[in-house]
Amino acid sequence: MTVGSQVVHDEPTILIAKLHALEPRLKDKNDHQARKECLRISKALTSQVEEPDNVAVSLAFSPVIALSARVAIDLNLFALVVQHGPVASASLAALSGAEELLIIRIMRLMSTAHLVEETAARTWSATRITKAMAREEIAAGHRFNSQVVVPAIQSAPDFFRENGYSCPTDTRKGLVQYALKTEQTAFDYIISNPSMLKDFNLFMGNAMGARKFWLDWFPVQSKILDGADPEKALIVDVGGGRGHDLIAFHKQFPNAGRLVVEDLPAVLEPLGEFSAFIEQVEHDFLSGEQPVKGARAYLCHHIMHDWPDSYCLRILEGIALAMTPGYSKLLLHEIIVPEQGACDFQAQSDITAMVCNGGMERTKQQFHTLLKAAGLSVVQIWESADEGGDGIVEAMKV
């Protein structure tokens, strides 16, 4: 079957035939490649049957979808539809306290965006996407993005025009600073706002969405557990926030070894029942050498994509100083952008990383170059089966 960039040039009838050919494979929930192909072909089919001018004009109005969804989240509309659907506009107005006319207009757009189902005039029911939108972790992401990412993106035309149309590399002179009129870095700005930090942490705990978690596909036994020194830390989660990864690891591999999560004091929070199994260490990964020496694995989950190359090099060099050659492994859990045929999520995440802190999503070659500069060598690059999913770059000290 033809996939990738070639598929967008096929005639609609050919694309429909390819979708039909996928039907037997889609019955197998474990055939992730079939799902990826189905999504790619479906998007290509949509682009072929829509009028080009309509697509171009709709794009100009597309920001209203996310912004209206943010209002719907503030009014708790998705949760109300899940709880009471099918539910009419009058009931939603009474339950939310908003004007009924506003409810009708917002929900009309949510329906056309397939976030809810319009089952009758001024009446909506929940779909599986509605249920996702009603989750607090996802609502937190929408709140955070509308306060930080959206203003930064809106400022992009002026910012790039004034800065010679080049990628930002100074974390104090980027799009967030330009848009929000602050001299703080994006992360300092977030930390200084408690409600924003809470939303950020909640959202990051759900950053994988429905994509497979790395513990489900990475060979933990052979790559981490086998040959591990019980006298040394097993995993150090660098910049690990509230410990999401290590909590999941402990649940799947209880008592496997010493687990350490590191982050800034303002980010670390009590781990409750897991505090007996996971150590917390205050550490700024930009400040210098890694404090936990000779661990089996140093995990960086969505760290590199937040930073320009020069900052990543500082982080990697600090970790490399603590690694034991031939034993310690560095695991970079990141989106790995293909040289051709990137999916929507990969491209969107790349631009988001750039506008937030001058970061980027990287290709295999970019990871090779970056790690080599830090005195590290790529052992293997593990790619997720999910569409737009993360991979893991496994590296060791040269």
From Swiss-Prot:
Its EC number is 2.1.1.-. GO terms for molecular function: O-methyltransferase activity. O-methyltransferase; part of the gene cluster that mediates the biosynthesis of penigequinolones, potent insecticidal alkaloids that contain a highly modified 10-carbon prenyl group. The first stage is catalyzed by the nonribosomal peptide synthetase penN that condenses anthranilic acid and O-methyl-L-tyrosine to produce 4'-methoxycyclopeptin. 4'-methoxycyclopeptin is then converted to 4'-methoxydehydrocyclopeptin by the ketoglutarate-dependent dioxygenase penM through dehydrogenation to form a double bond between C-alpha and C-beta of the O-methyltyrosine side chain. Belongs to the class I-like SAM-binding methyltransferase superfamily. Cation-independent O-methyltransferase family. The keyword Transport does not apply. GO terms for biological process: methylation; secondary metabolite biosynthetic process. This is O-methyltransferase penC. The keyword Methyltransferase applies. Keywords: Methyltransferase, S-adenosyl-L-methionine, Transferase. The gene is penC. Gene3D superfamilies: Vaccinia Virus protein VP39, Winged helix-like DNA-binding domain superfamily/Winged helix DNA-binding domain. The active site is at 305 (proton acceptor). It holds the Pfam family Methyltransf_2. S-adenosyl-L-methionine binds at residue 263.
